[in-house]
Regions:
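Face-selective signature of the C-terminal outer-membrane beta-barrel domain
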Residues: 219-245, 267-413, 436, 440, ...
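Extracytoplasmic beta-strand/coil segments of soluble accessory domains associated
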Residues: 43, 66-98
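Outer-membrane beta-barrel signature, preferentially recognizing the C-terminal barrel domain
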Residues: 376-379, 422, 451-505, 522-534, ...
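Outer membrane beta-barrel strand-and-loop segments of large Gram-negative receptors
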Residues: 328-332, 383, 473-475, 479, ...
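N-terminal periplasmic accessory domains that precede
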Residues: 33, 65-68, 102-103, 117-118, ...
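Short acidic/polar hinge/loop motifs at secondary-structure boundaries
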Residues: 71, 97-123
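Surface-exposed extracellular loop regions of Gram-negative outer-membrane beta-barrel proteins
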Residues: 137-152, 244, 249-253, 305-309, ...
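Short, acidic, small-residue-rich periplasmic hinge/interaction motif at the N-terminus
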Residues: 20-56, 78-79, 87, 119-120, ...
Length: 690
């Protein structure tokens, strides 16, 4: 008999163990969480959902939710960021509510995970910009009273970084109170060179620069809230404050052609803060209909002061100041009920987003071609959606439809720009059909139409000074993209196949080209493009005793003509993840990966033949104390170089990232719990764009 587990993408606030007297029915409740079968696979395909069970596996003692996700099929975690192969960054839900920041995954213990589900064809309920969804279910805890967790980490790469987090909760009767506070000091160092070659005034020209970036920053988070439940109704709210201070420095040089390099230093001081408040309500009507409401408010502000100074005479200091303010109001209301022997969900969602950017160039000469300016964007969005799911015999069917109205307004120096402002009506359908041959063999096919909205920083009209001959900027004329995605997903025993073909219209990519100015200037900025792409991944994953391997091979191939050239070299990649249970309760993870050189949009990335990460962990004092030692890029073989060839400008960027290092993490828990705020972001996609 085997206890198997379903696992996939992202995770929730801290879930903690408790000491003290158990409720009399705790054993019954705990047994209800465990499924015991003779041949249940560790990872299985249910319709278009890949399910991984964590409870009872080697993965449950890895440390945090991030550690577990890094070992799951089609999942990758790098520097705390979760991604899905061929899909990019997923939306993560923990116990039905969305994750709002990466700290939730760091604070969630792997021993509190029950299962992880990966949706590669999410329906209309998740929004038309969502390509993948990770749903994490935690093990239920029934403890009352006080819970406490403290996690401290120290990391040494080229520089030292450290963080400390304290999480506390208290529950009595129907009321739960929780609070979290953390402070982190990050520091990194990136070295590299950038060389641009082009034809200018009928002659070959070269513009180059060297970089030695130091990026220390201090980040704080304070969060507090409550949950209250009574019978079939529950409600809650929380508030989060997030200040941040960064003091960046870049020392290097600039040159053109055969001239001697000019030494320069770029200093940038960034101060930002954000406030977020959220409320929710859940109601179960007549035992059949679930009613859910979420409301979200966010306000943030930041100030960035940049000064570029040159050691040689004849070059004046170039300084600028940028002030940015943004706000978001959003609401979401939906109801779920049984319909035609299936599950039906319908609802509405709205949001209002306002962003104001005031950019001031303080150098008069540079201001002739990089002017000061005030830009504002306002977006109103209203959506209605419906989703129906049903399983009959060996078939599973899911169909959905989403309508969205978007009113986007762009103002430049107090005047509305009608060429950029627009109103859109979007109708996006999705459908998925799956068939199960047996417990370990199934297949599904799905189609989804979705939209791709550029992040708000890419929609600004301001330009930024990068060097004597280089500029970077946004593009307020960027249009929302449309994406058609046809996908086949299959599983046979321990093998998983995921193949998708995407046709993207008006997605965006970066290009570099000549900028009209009195002197030679190059500008890098985003533009709309049309691209077709094929993703193909084959995974083998099957636990074998104390060893849990996961081997993935894949290929990405795109068809793109942009910037006066073709970008269609395929990228082949592999991932070999291993978890081994050692004696004395220790766990060892060893992960290797690599990829060939190839094109992704207008960028051609370099080859990494082999890179290795590893970690070892152990729990002490009845799992109250966890100790973990991890190492990244052990042999320093990661290749972060990339090139771009657009509009007659050939750019080669060689850079050495700060990835090689060692981290020690200590986690102490006293009566930890999994329960936290039960609501979800009313407009998570707008929060991500901000």
């Amino acid at each position: 008999m085997h206890i198997r587990i379903c696992f996939l993408s992202a995770l929730l606030p801290t879930v903690f163990l408790a000491s003290g007297e158990e409720p009399s029915d705790s054993l019954v409740r705990e047994l209800q969480e465990i499924v015991v079968t003779a041949d249940q696979p560790a990872t299985r395909l249910e319709g278009n959902v890949l399910v991984s069970t964590i409870t009872g596996s080697n993965l449950q003692n890895l440390g945090t939710a991030l550690d577990v996700l890094a070992q799951l099929p089609l999942m990758k975690v790098e520097d705390g960021a979760v991604s899905v192969a061929g899909k990019g960054i997923p939306d993560v839900y923990i116990d039905g509510r969305p994750m709002r920041d990466g700290d939730e995954l760091r604070n969630l213990s792997s021993s509190d995970l029950k299962k992880v589900e990966l949706l590669l064809a999410p329906g209309a309920m998740y929004g038309n910009t969502t390509e993948a969804v990770v749903r994490i279910t935690t093990r239920k805890r029934f403890w009352k009273g006080f819970s406490f967790t403290n996690r401290a980490a120290a990391e040494k790469r080229r520089c030292w970084s450290a963080s400390d987090m304290i999480d506390a909760g208290w529950r009595s009767g129907n009321l739960e109170l929780f609070a979290t506070g953390s402070v982190s000091r990050y520091d990194s160092r990136i070295k590299g060179t950038t060389v641009n070659r082009l034809e200018y005034d009928g002659e070959e020209a070269e513009i180059g620069s060297s970089q030695d970036n130091r990026a220390p920053s201090t980040v704080g988070v304070v969060k507090a809230g409550f949950n209250f439940s009574s019978g079939a109704h529950s409600a809650g709210a929380y508030y989060r404050y997030n200040p941040e201070h960064g003091d960046f420095c870049n020392e290097g040089s600039e040159w053109t052609g055969t001239t001697a390099p000019v030494r320069r230093r770029i200093d940038r001081d960034i101060r930002s803060r954000s406030h977020l408040a959220a409320v929710y309500y859940d109601g179960n009507l007549a035992g059949k209909c679930l009613l859910h409401f979420d409301g979200t408010f966010r306000r943030s502000s930041s100030t960035s002061a940049t000064a570029t100074t040159y050691a040689e005479e004849g070059y004046a200091e170039v300084s600028s100041v940028e002030k940015k303010n943004s706000s978001l109001y959003a609401g979401k209301l939906y109801a779920s009920l049984p319909l035609f022997k299936g599950d039906f969900t319908t609802g509405i969602q709205d949001s209002y987003t306002h962003t104001r950017l005031d950019y001031r160039m303080l150098n008069q000469a540079v201001g002739e071609y990089i002017p000061s300016g005030l830009t504002e964007t306002r977006q109103k969005s209203l959506a209605a959606f419906a989703q129906w799911n049903r399983t009959f015999h060996r078939f599973s069917l899911s169909a959905g439809l989403r309508y969205e109205y978007v009113d986007y307004a762009f103002d430049k120096d107090g005047r509305r720009d009608n060429d950029v402002s627009r109103r859109n009506h979007l109708l996006t359908p999705d459908i998925s059909l799956g068939y199960s041959f047996c417990d370990d063999a199934s297949v599904s096919i799905s189609y989804k139409m979705s939209t791709e909205k550029p992040p708000y920083p890419q929609l600004t009209g301001s330009l930024n000074y990068v060097g004597i001959h280089e500029i970077e900027g946004g593009n307020p004329a960027l249009r929302d993209g449309r994406m058609h995605n046809l996908q086949v997903f299959g599983m046979w025993r321990g093998f998983i196949l995921q193949a998708s073909f995407m046709r993207s219209i008006d997605t965006y990519a970066f290009v570099k080209e000549l900028y009209p100015a009195p002197t030679l200037q190059l500008m890098m900025h985003p533009v709309n493009i049309d691209v077709s792409a094929l993703n193909l991944f084959l995974v083998w994953s099957r636990p074998m005793g104390k060893w849990t391997p996961n081997f993935t091979v894949g290929v990405y191939r795109q068809w793109l003509e942009a910037g006066g050239g073709r970008h269609d070299r395929p990228i082949f990649s592999y991932y070999l993840d291993n978890v081994v249970a050692l004696p004395f309760g220790m766990l060892l993870s060893v992960n290797a990966h690599g990829q060939t050189s190839g094109d992704m949009h207008t960028n051609r990335f370099g080859t990494t033949w082999f890179a290795l990460d590893a970690s070892i962990s152990r729990s002490f004092f009845n799992e109250s104390l966890d100790v973990k030692l991890s190492a990244t890029d052990i042999f320093g073989t990661l290749n972060n170089d990339w090139t771009m060839d657009t509009y007659g400008v050939s750019m080669v960027k060689r850079q050495s990232y700060d990835r090689r290092g060692v981290t020690l993490t200590l986690t102490y828990r006293f009566r930890p719990r999994a329960s936290r705020y039960k609501g979800e972001a009313a407009s998570q996609s707008e929060l991500d764009r901000l």
